[in-house]
Amino acid sequence: MSDVSNEAARRRTFAIISHPDAGKTTLTEKLLLFGGAIQMAGSVKGRKAARHATSDWMALEKERGISVTSSVMQFPYEGKIVNLLDTPGHADFGEDTYRVLTAVDSALMVIDVAKGVEERTIKLMEVCRLRDTPIMTFINKLDREGKNPIDLLDEVETVLGIQCAPVTWPIGMGQRLKGVVHLISGEVHLYEQGRNFTRQDSTIFPSLDAPGLAEKIGEQMLTELRDELELVQGASNPFDLDAYRAGQQTPVFFGSGVNNFGVQPLLDFFIEHAPPPQTRETTGRRVAPSETKLSGFVFKIQANMDPQHRDRVAFMRVCSGKFTAGMKTLHVRSGKDVKLANALTFMASDREIAAEAWPGDVIGIHNHGTISIGDTFTEGESLSFTGIPNFAPELFRRARLRDPLKLKQLQKGLAQLSEEGATQFFRPLMSNDLILGAVGVLQFDVVAYRLKDEYGVDAIFEPVSVTTARWVHCDNVKKLDEFREKNAGNLGIDAAGQLVYLAPTRVNLQLAQERAPDVRFSATREHVHAKAID
């Protein structure tokens, strides 16, 4: 095996997905703790404490206690290199989450034991389904009272349409929580106060028949557990690696992230069974991770990771070959050669200069406005990775300045924030308005906060008569020009220079579509080959 194949085989690149407040950020902290990446996991609840959760690094996130931008964290574990991409838990940031899911090889779904499958989980699951992403499930907050575990498995299977294969099973919950039993190894991991539940600091019995176990959990509970396990193993599916890798089955674990309990069995199983980097589709051909030439795509752009410097970093997922510091690459969209000199690796907001990176790794490239989401970098081959979408926003606001002299800063700020995908930004053809589009109201708060904090611009967002937007395409240039003339009042340009129809009502959109049968109206736009505008 070549170096590239060896290194690719060691990588495990995944994202954690969940409904807000299911405990995703806490679990992220605990995984990093096991990887030795952080010494002291920051509790998510004590917001006023100086120590904030490692993965929530933007000032606004620290204030509100929600993950708004996705971070990238890398840590070694058991001879493997784990790349963990944290995703925004808040409902308004679905688009950013979707794009992160294009950059991973598998996902970990976190479910609150008391709430079960929630709306956001369903949406994220649909996204994973589009790509057949393999998913493991961690049912969290076992130290609190919650739903019956058998009912939870049934809920996941029915609502999310994926087969469940329980790998660990709870022994009681809430006040009665005694531990979990590992259904594959047979081990029993006890839950005891004051332990940190690493293998070195846990009481583990080799099986349910081990002497001394009955004393620890009580004869009655042991009998109930045996009956329950008989029922569970009869009614559920055994773990099937092929079904999991095809996205048809999810191995299920139970635990309590905040207490570190049940996390290590999950991490050990993940390391053993989650897929390494996979072959990926491009416009020309499929690219295998073992190829010796570098290729990668940008799935996210983050402005101002370092408040001391107005910087922008493009996050690139390496898909094949080896990245070395200072190497020359082809920026496919512009056709220019770009030297990747000071690329970064990440531990949330702690960054280090990357000396090398392999398939599955994520590196940060300093971006001075020339790189867009969806851009591909190669060692010379002209190909582009596909499937990184922009969604039509559902909410729109007009930006108005309190200080009209700050127009230039406002335009720059909006262009940069839309480039990183925090919002979408449209300029109507027939007016000087600056219109923002978002998936949820919180996004406008975030943009207003960041404009003020990072660009010194105080902007107000007012309602505007736009209900929805569609990207407009037509192969016939003459027909497109005609359409443009007739509908100029409803047309605008997005931040990538694409023509967009800004519909005041759904009825108006329907009429426009009926009157222009040759014009295609799209609710999503691929980031591939997006053209940047000043």
From Swiss-Prot:
UniProt name for this protein: Peptide chain release factor 3
Xref: SUPFAM superfamilies: EF-G C-terminal domain-like, P-loop containing nucleoside triphosphate hydrolases, Translation proteins
Its biological purpose: Increases the formation of ribosomal termination complexes and stimulates activities of RF-1 and RF-2. It binds guanine nucleotides and has strong preference for UGA stop codons. It may interact directly with the ribosome. The stimulation of RF-1 and RF-2 is significantly reduced by GTP and GDP, but not by GMP.
InterPro entries documented for this protein: EF-G-like_DII (IPR053905), EFG_III/V (IPR035647), G_TR_CS (IPR031157), P-loop_NTPase (IPR027417), PrfC (IPR004548), RF3_C (IPR032090), RF3_dom_3_sf (IPR038467), RF3_GTP-bd (IPR041732)
Positions of GTP binding: 18-25, 86-90, 140-143
An annotated GO BP: regulation of translational termination
Subcellular localization(s) per the UniProt record: Cytoplasm
A GO MF label: translation release factor activity, codon specific
Family label: Belongs to the TRAFAC class translation factor GTPase superfamily. Classic translation factor GTPase family. PrfC subfamily.
Keyword Protein biosynthesis: yes
Taxonomic lineage of the native organism: Bacteria, Pseudomonadati, Pseudomonadota, Gammaproteobacteria, Lysobacterales
Organism, scientific name: Xanthomonas oryzae pv. oryzae (strain KACC10331 / KXO85)
